[in-house]
């Protein structure tokens, strides 16, 4: 089908972004940073200047966003409520209702790794030493959810992934958790001395996460596929009543939607499982929700939105 082009007079057509648009991500060797670099590249083709900021994780991302130091942030959806509560308690910032989902991105797999043959299921982590990533990061938040739901009392430690793997090799740790879009480059560098630990199906987790598998398709060293869950991630922004901010958000989202095929072909592998055309009616940012709905309607009829 030949894609037809249509110019639509939206807010984004009335207000032109005049300054760089900042997005908080995560460590510069993680999936968020790579995804944001892809976004930066496609946005540049539309004349949008996106600056990618590396961070320690979700706690820092939401704090930077809530205090206005960045325009947007990539965050795991299960982290928003948890981190908002922490920031309200520790720093007096009430951010939950002020932060909205600008664009859904993709599900991030929960990687649980061990080099011990007697640890095959998450239930076998009872009383074990488990690294849950850096303090305040999305992995630590997801780990807290898993330990609570599975009712597992483990000895948790906060470590960078490389340090955690070294400690596990030296016998000082029994397992390592990491949440990230597979394939994660540094996990891909491991070998078959390690294996993935299964996350058993759970009705509560089924309401929060997406059921999936990790194995050979993502990591060549994996000897079998292992059941796990994935955490949806999204670009989040502030619920500002500011027309220029709304214009920037809409322009950014439109550049991503219009570049979906290019991103799937040439960007990070997670774009192949992206959920960018979905939206949350209540938690979503209204200006971009409206744009996504319009995009979906026109896309289903073979039209494409272009800026005028």
Predicted region positions:
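Pocket-flanking alpha-helical
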Residues: 53-92, 165-167, 182-190
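A structural signal for short loop-to-beta-strand junctions that line the ligand-binding cleft
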Residues: 92-105, 218-226
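Bilobed "Venus flytrap"/periplasmic-binding protein-like clamshell domains
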Residues: 21-44, 51, 108-166, 170
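Sec-dependent N-terminal signal peptides
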Residues: 5-18
């Amino acid at each position: 089908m030949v894609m037809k082009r249509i110019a639509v007079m939206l807010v984004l057509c009335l207000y032109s972004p005049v300054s760089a648009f900042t997005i908080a991500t995560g460590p510069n060797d993680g999936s968020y940073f790579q995804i944001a670099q892809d976004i930066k590249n496609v946005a540049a083709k539309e004349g949008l200047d996106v600056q990618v900021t590396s961070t320690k994780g979700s706690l820092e991302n939401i704090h930077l966003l809530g205090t206005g130091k960045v325009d947007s942030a990539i965050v795991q959806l299960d982290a928003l409520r948890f981190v908002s509560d922490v920031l309200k308690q520790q720093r007096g910032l009430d951010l939950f209702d002020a932060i909205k989902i600008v664009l859904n991105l993709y599900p991030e797999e929960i990687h649980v790794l061990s080099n011990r043959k007697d640890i095959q299921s998450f239930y076998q982590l009872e009383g074990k030493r488990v690294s849950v990533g850096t303090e305040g990061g999305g992995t630590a938040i997801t780990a807290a959810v898993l330990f609570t739901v599975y009712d597992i009392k483990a000895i948790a430690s906060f470590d960078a992934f490389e340090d955690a793997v070294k400690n596990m090799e030296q016998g000082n740790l029994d397992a390592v958790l990491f949440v990230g879009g597979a394939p994660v480059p540094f996990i891909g560098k491991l070998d078959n001395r390690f294996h993935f630990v299964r996350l058993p199906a759970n009705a509560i987790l089924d309401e929060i996460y997406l059921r999936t598998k990790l194995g050979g398709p993502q990591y060549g060293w994996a000897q079998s596929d292992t059941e796990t869950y994935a955490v949806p991630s999204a670009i989040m922004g502030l619920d500002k009543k500011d027309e220029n901010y709304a214009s920037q958000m809409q322009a950014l989202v439109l550049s991503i939607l219009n570049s979906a095929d290019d991103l799937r072909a040439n960007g990070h592998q997670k774009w192949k499982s992206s959920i960018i055309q979905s939206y949350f009616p209540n938690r979503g940012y209204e200006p971009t929700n409206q744009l996504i709905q319009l995009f979906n309607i026109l896309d289903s009829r073979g039209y494409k939105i272009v800026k005028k």
